[in-house]
Amino acid sequence: MSKRRYTYYQPNDKDLKDNYGDCAIRTICKAENLSWLDAYDMMYRLSREVQCPMNCKYGFEHILKSKGYVYTGISNKKGTKRPTVDSFTKEHLEGTYVLIVANHYVCSKDGHYFDIWDSGECSMYGYWVKEE
């Protein structure tokens, strides 16, 4: 069995026990190389434009689009399996991706995924990739 590509990532030094439920902010921090506060401020400003919370699907999509990300959905046709966070990351060794799983966001960057827990077995529903 091959090695997982998971790296623990917690940019919020106030969340000592990983209890804040701020995966949207953590994901943007890593994807955009921002501090937690800078990511929060940017996301708050952009979510105000559409008057939708930053971690709500529509609000988060608005933020990603405004930063140059493009969405790709993952089909779940009969007889097929969705890729997991770990399998997707192993196949995408370059680039920055925001991965969508059930009720959670994960950043995959240059062949590693970053989270406060090993979300590698989670099945993906889609992903956002930053167009350069």
Where are these regions (language model features)?
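Conserved active-site-adjacent core of cysteine acyl-enzyme catalytic domains
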Residues: S47-N103, K109-D118
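Active-site nucleophile-adjacent alpha helix/oxyanion-hole segment immediately C-terminal to the catalytic cysteine
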Residues: M1-P53, K57-T72
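Noncatalytic regulatory segments and standalone regulatory/sensor domains
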Residues: Y113-E132
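Intrinsically disordered, low-complexity segments enriched in small/polar residues
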Residues: R4-T7, G95, S123-Y125
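Extracellular and analogous surface-interaction loops
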Residues: I28-E32, T89, E132
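Surface-exposed beta-strand edges and flanking loops
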Residues: Q10, V101, K130-E131
